[in-house]
Amino acid sequence: GETLGAAGYHAVALDARGHGDSDWAGEGNYGAEKMVEDLKCVVTELGSGSPILVGASMGAGTSLVAIGEKGMTAKALVMVDMAPRIEPAGQAKIQEFMNQKPDGFDSLEEVAEAIANYQPHRKRPRNLDGLAKNVRLADNGKYVWHWDPARRSSRPGAPDYRERLHKAADNLTLPVLLVRGGLSDVLSEEGAQSFLDQCPHAEYVN
């Protein structure tokens, strides 16, 4: 954020519904339509006209649908670890990670252990205070992830959603940058290349 600000950009990090510090949807509605609607409302409220949208995973999918289905205009789109074609095994691993300890973790040490098991390549922090931003303290005194558990049953990943992403990608004419984490098991190199074949004007960083 500081780097973008120094370059003259006005950067806003959006916590989508059910994520981070945003409220959870009382009706448990986390479909693509609602996500796109929320995004459009925020952009309208900011009065920023045509923004540059940067999204990772779900945020990238929301941005792709919003732009590709002509729901809003943007100056450019940056998608991180997300494309119409993703790896089922990688997505299943995320689901498994999300579904563990549904009643919460007893301590930040347990949270750190769960993250270390999910991302063994990352160095485990000595100071666990920073993990507090990833969890919230529930009424039962346990730590739960900073997302609504109802999302576990409404995560977009069905074939019809993937087909929707494919169709949206066909309509992209604005500048696009696809970023893939080198160790990503969700977006493979093949998945990235498939998107580049579909959107040949896009730039790519691995």
Over which residues does each language-model region extend?
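Active-site loop/oxyanion-hole signature of alpha/beta-hydrolase fold enzymes
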Residues: 2-6, 10-54
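Structural signature of beta-strand start/N-cap positions in the alpha/beta core
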Residues: 10, 49-52, 73-76, 175-177, ...
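Active-site loop signature of alpha/beta-hydrolase-fold enzymes
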Residues: 19-22, 85, 186
